[in-house]
Amino acid sequence: SAASDVYKRQFINILAGVTDKTSGEVIVWGFDLDKNPRQVRVSLGIVPQEINVDPFFTPKKLLDLQAGLFGVKKKDRITDTILDLVALKDKSNSYTRNLSGGMKRRLLIAKALVHKPPIIILDEPTAGVDVELRKNLWENIRSLRKLGVTIILTTHYLQEAEELCDRIGIIHKGNLIALDTTENMLNKIQTKTLKFEINKRIVLDDMENKGYNILTNTDSEFKIEYNKQEFNIQKIIKLLENQGIVIKDIKSEDPDLEDVFVNLTNN
């Protein structure tokens, strides 16, 4: 929602030192924002949602400038390593105005890494990008995780959160309404859907009140919803066989993060 976007942006701006908080406490990597603001900012690398890079510098020059702003000495800079990590080493001396949109997004990630922060904030890194670029950015994010970097990812794309995150928080109307591991979050919905491809319509007299809800019953498809903790699918298969039904195929559908999100925000 728009309200959640505003609060999310304010939260990131507070961490970045752009906005002063009015109340509360912020602890980042053991540092209190009020007492140690510099240490907090050095502990973070923030990748903004908007693509905003100087078109007249090369990636290599931009990273060196960024490192200088954080006080990284020349002998301690890892510019080439970072460019290699985000697959931009072959473009290190090209003007940024000549880079594609995907390359510019990767360059923003590279800028956030110059001072070796333990935490990276990626603000909707794949917003508005095509499928191929999204997959490439996902691989970059996974590479950072393997290096031990803690990543805070903001996204409206729920599949992205489910695919990449170990823990997920959901903001609704400015409030954090859920925060848990991805596995626990997905387990918040206990129902599961089962779809049978069959050869004829099922007689429902024998099929009702068996611990599941019938969603579809046609000449070719029978679909049910059931509680995965309480119901054994062998029971339904046995009932179908008793009616002389030929099961051509079975497809199982687990709830995804979108189902969890809708359930939480509606309640």
Where are these regions (language model features)?
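Conserved ABC ATPase signature
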Residues: 95-99
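Catalytic Walker B motif of ABC-type/P-loop ATPase nucleotide-binding domains
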Residues: 120-123
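Conserved catalytic motifs of ABC-family nucleotide-binding domains
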Residues: 116
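Conserved ABC transporter NBD signature motif
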Residues: 24-32, 39-40
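Conserved ABC ATPase "signature" region
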Residues: 64, 68-91
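Short, small-residue-biased leader/transition segments that mark boundaries at the very start
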Residues: 2-7
